[in-house]
């Protein structure tokens, strides 16, 4: 142990850890305080001297009561799952969750993010189980008594909250990237799906290495899931832990890997969070904002520009839909509890701020700055200030205004946009007025596209005042003016456009959000012929989210035959199961018995969401047929929408004897899943039928 602030006293985190009698070398033991082991050393040590402390203890994590956060809903540190094996639906497991300071519940340690060390764990486990920890498994010793000692060694320094161990009955599926072992620990029944669930990890590594200019810095990478996990996932160094929601069967994966962006998020943490760690919880943005934004980067790279922009848009909306958080600074030097910083500001808002920063400096400088930040702080700590210095070093620009505004400030702009054509001057006037309540004015670099007679002219302006006016040449009234043309800014805007302008915008759209704005306005003006034209065109859009939005916009009661035919086509053969699901829902709203055979056929689709939508549609026109199919489906393994559809129909039309099935389905679902939330309604509906006081 080498600690520059120690001289003759050592203070170590101690949460419900009982010290046991032991010979302690070079240490005069004192009674522990409530939360710390506070001990006098035998002499004064200089910062360069190394000394060893031995502590014999028993940890009691089940007795610890700590505050949770929005991201992590418990704080025991170490968890025993189904330890006595009494629950036949759940395997026996042990796993740990260190963030924020849960490691010190089971391990006496200086439990702060700016403390880094190597580690070695010797785990005695039942021989039938496997273990996982940070670093490499360097040795296994058979005790000849049904147990085994696994020795895991981590020889590169990392923070205590990233210390990890897990034990359980897992199957290990091996992969490889540039000679480094990639391991996927799965429950036995998911062995065949392991590569489909985790198999993009090598491609993600290659992409992140390429944009950062830094190879994956650790000896191996393993991924594992834990039952009853208290969060979504955790980037424990070399050993990421996922919720069991990552485990998807073959039918689920037909609808796409719902956990792909989470896998990308946790991997990116191995640079931003593990290699360079936030120096304090106040600076958690340099961990979480980057991991959040990595999802946008990965989807943009792997699935195209629209997919990346959609991910960015969803993050923006998640932040904007939490107005109570708007007054929080991204870098939070003042908070009531460290858990409070894990919120939409540190994640989604921070990710959108990085998106603006990337656009401000350009891709080349953005990724070079990230490289510089990582190289200069590797195996150490980072902060927003260090990030700023890296960007200024690469770009040669003073970025005080950007970081003061977005990192060390709060809120976001609310703008009112007015457009006027001045025929005598042959100009278009754009007035941008900031109306946010805070006593602050944002500095905003804004890209503007002005379309005149089909020709696009691009301009770059700066909005630095509460009200700014901009004039642009226009020989005739513009077809459309697209402000924030690349949809970069984190703001709320209020602007009025005609349906003709939105029709032009959709037809000449350069990105996903332009088209989304157009179909949203068209949906509000559904009786207008131009709005109808926008929505009909959107039914054939190249991006599935736009097609879904267009379907949702039509009122089933007012569908014309051509549009109904198109929606039927989408329900039958769209490449996206989510679009099929939406189209079936739209057809269901017609209550046409002529679709009974199709709905019945689609209940057997290989996709859970398609079959579930079809079952709901069938129930609207023939509840007896739907009940029969739901009863048959209840004898099989079902998930996602098919599960919620089956349980809803059984609860509504079935007898008391369906209670056991629904109770079992409800019980086995992850508590954090949307599926369990929706099933709560059906479960409650069923209870009044059960005659069991």
Named regions from a protein language model:
Residues 1-217, 344, 359-361, 377:
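Acidic/His-enriched low-complexity segments
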Residues 495-505, 527-539, 559-572, 592-604, ...:
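Amphipathic alpha-helical scaffolding segments comprising HEAT/armadillo-like alpha-solenoid repeats
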